[in-house]
Amino acid sequence: VSLLIAVVAIKRESFRLLVTAAVVFVFLGLIVGPIAGGAYAHTDMANQMQSDAKELETLPNSSKENVRVLPRSVSDNYARSSMQYPQYKLRSSDITYRNGSYTWSYGLEPDNPMVALSGQQRGALYVDITGTEKQVTIEETAFSNGRGQYLFDSYRYQNVLRSPFKKHNWDTTFNAQANGKSYIAHSTTTYKWKFRMGPIPQFYAIPQHGSVEVMSPSGDIESMSPKEAQELSLLQGQNFYPYDIAMFKVKSMQYVNGALNKWLWKEDVLQIANLPEDGNNWPIAVPTEGDSPGLTYFIATEPTGSGNGVYEIWTIDGQTGEAAVQQYSESQLGPQKAVDFTERRSEVNQLSSAEAIAPVPVVNGETLYWHVKVVSESNSGIIYTAFVNAESGDVTLVEGTDPIYAFLTQSEVEEIQNGTEAGSSGGMSMNVVVTDEAGEIVGTQNITVPEGGNVDVSVTDKISNRSST
């Protein structure tokens, strides 16, 4: 349009028309065009999600072997207090699968310009994520082109040099070790370009997972397609699907009834649920059950303007990007409300220097809980963890690591106590969970139930001298 006006302006030698052409170009090309392009991209993705996303009857159950317990803020404190290298500092962390468990992974990168110019990344530090205790492992491996190095030795420079036409998702970068090999990896995004004639003619781009870039300590980079990365044993258990594409998919559902409805009427328009400002961001990566270890991204949504009530939980596979949704007929408690409910408990409320943070979705059977951590204000450790039932609002407060895993196996314990089959030909070892009248876990004990056998469990209250079997 602006080009046609400019041609007419030149023929008529009209300065006013030339200015009009420039204004039209700026307004349509630099303002309206990108807005229209964004709306087209979201609308296309919403249509794709409607046809591809699976509707769930039950959310993926959380892993009972690897529970995401340790908040990033406490992990950061544990990691800093374990640093023994004055010329190095910790890179920002991400979740990494290592030796059968999940950890927060930190790169050990140079801390000053001289070391960054002449030195190398020293390796990585790992903090176990599956318990409340401090468990830190340091792996010393020199990377020729590591994180935090300058100029041509930089990890970022080498990757951009190799793949200059991809968007590199540095927020997905992680250090890891598998099969005796250390490596650094991150994902990239590419774009599928389209053109739409109306109502405003515009090119637009839809993001898609481009590749996974894996760098060895020697600096060699292997660029793999998402499919190749999913089949690589080196990346087993890792999550490498881009976080921003996962969010783009869910946010696109705001456009399911059209862009005008999203902007003006807002009928059936979702919004991403609020998270407390403690370092957690959507999507939240959670270890889930399956044939092999894996992480699932969770994103909670609520109706626009509804407050803190969740009515949908979206899940995105941490490797394939496959999307699914659990819809609720009645509003569920959101993560912010779960934190509020935890802070109201007398045990937490009476603590003068503690706060409830980092709600993480945990699914046990058909029940959704928000797993909230009560930590000291200095983030020096976890005081309590709380399981907040998203349907009823009931809060179960536990202390230490063992009761967390005991809580998640309560249904299995109840099956044994009710005389149902254990489902194992050789018997089964289980955790017996003892709760008081308020539902608090006051004790746990491992027991072995023989095949076809029964076990009597006697519990004695030493205060009231009452017992039950």
Protein language model features and the residues they cover:
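Soluble extracytoplasmic regions of secretory-pathway and membrane proteins
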Residues: 1-469
